[in-house]
From Swiss-Prot:
SUPFAM superfamilies: Ribosomal protein L16p/L10e
NCBIfam families found in the cross-reference section: rplP_bact
RNA-binding keyword on record: yes
Entry GO CC: cytosolic large ribosomal subunit
PANTHER family in UniProt: 50S/60S RIBOSOMAL PROTEIN L16, LARGE RIBOSOMAL SUBUNIT PROTEIN UL16M
Subunit structure: Part of the 50S ribosomal subunit.
Gene name, Swiss-Prot/TrEMBL: rplP
Family classification: Belongs to the universal ribosomal protein uL16 family.
Source organism, top-level taxon: Bacteria
Protein function: Binds 23S rRNA and is also seen to make contacts with the A and possibly P site tRNAs.
Record key words, sorted: Ribonucleoprotein, Ribosomal protein, RNA-binding, rRNA-binding, tRNA-binding
HAMAP family: Ribosomal_uL16
Protein's recorded name: Large ribosomal subunit protein uL16
Molecular function (Gene Ontology), one example: rRNA binding
Length: 141
């Protein structure tokens, strides 16, 4: 599972996830990508499940890049615990995703194969995404 090696603080405030992405919206490596069209949170299990789905479909051909990293701790108190007594223990690591953010990139496969593989990955994610190519990347979300 993806998680930071070390952090300055163990726990973090929830924060708000508003607006559009202004970083990670352009192609860096591949020819095809999966771009978020709505806001949400993605955890390390979802990132890994989607990566496995698209890697198995292309039978390890081409190259895949994961453009997101879960760097925010999400805490949870144990079940049937009374309120108070401090913040809960870290349960999982997540990343806030804003519309326009590129999640995965692919290269070295045909467009049809990349579209099908990224569609399989799309179903593993908790927010809406769309398939984009390097030529169509300038379209609005």
């Amino acid at each position: 599972m993806l998680m930071p090696k070390r952090t300055k603080y163990r726990k973090m405030m929830k924060g708000r996830n508003r607006g559009y992405a202004n970083r990670g919206t352009e192609f860096t490596f591949g020819e095809f990508a999966l771009k978020a069209t709505e806001a949400g949170r993605i955890n390390s299990r979802q990132i890994e499940a989607a990566r496995i789905a698209l890697t198995r479909f292309v039978k390890r051909q081409g190259k895949t890049w994961i453009r997101v990293f879960p760097d925010k701790p999400l805490t949870k108190k144990p079940l049937e615990t009374r309120m108070g007594k401090g913040k809960g223990a870290v349960e999982e690591w997540v990343m806030n995703i804003k519309p326009g953010r590129i999640i995965y990139e692919m290269a070295g496969v045909s467009e049809e194969m990349a579209r099908e593989a990224l569609t399989l990955a799309m179903h593993k994610l908790p927010f809406k995404t769309k398939f984009v190519t390097r030529e169509s990347q300038n379209e609005i979300y």
